[in-house]
Amino acid sequence: MGGGSWGYKSSSEYPGATPVHFSAWSKEKISVCVPQTVDNGTSNITLPAVYQSSTHANSCGIYKATTSTSDEYFLFENRSSGGYDQGLNMLLLDNSSIYTVGSNYSGGAAIWHVKDILSTCYADNSCMNESPPLVDLEEANNADLDNGSSQGRTTHLFYSANSATFNNSSTPDSKLYDNSSSGISVTSISAAGDNMTLTISK
């Protein structure tokens, strides 16, 4: 899983009270949340901060964009600083530096690329060896999760001051793992905050 600190296990408690939220995929997989499916066409979406999930009890504020490949899709969530996600302050590196972001962390939209073949690889214990990862955070900038250079950076999230577009020709791109177009385009991603807006076309 290319996820780093975005869903870190309980050893990440800081300072003993804020283990960070599970990733959107983890919440979906254990049936804690049922993501809201993005309609075909163009949708203007508001992503609430995941720490406010109690007000969005069923979906937890997570959105899901399916593709033409039945087991491949994208999940969207807002990892704003607050609640248990305050623990990210001491886990994430600030931009491209080697220092944690601390109180300057404001969050952003996390975009997850999922290849849901867990039942297949689990049977022969090969899930950890899958390439590309079955669950991968699309790193907006300073991509270094997959090579182990960091556990997460503020610039891995999407927000207007960092990266506001995710489509077939962006870096990273929204292509499927076979390099064909997913048909997913995300534009007009807002500034980081407890309620982020973006436009998804599919």
State the predicted function of each range.
Residues 35-202:
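Non-catalytic C-terminal accessory/binding modules of secreted extracellular proteins
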Residues 1-33:
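Post-HExxH zinc-binding segment in Zn-dependent metallohydrolases
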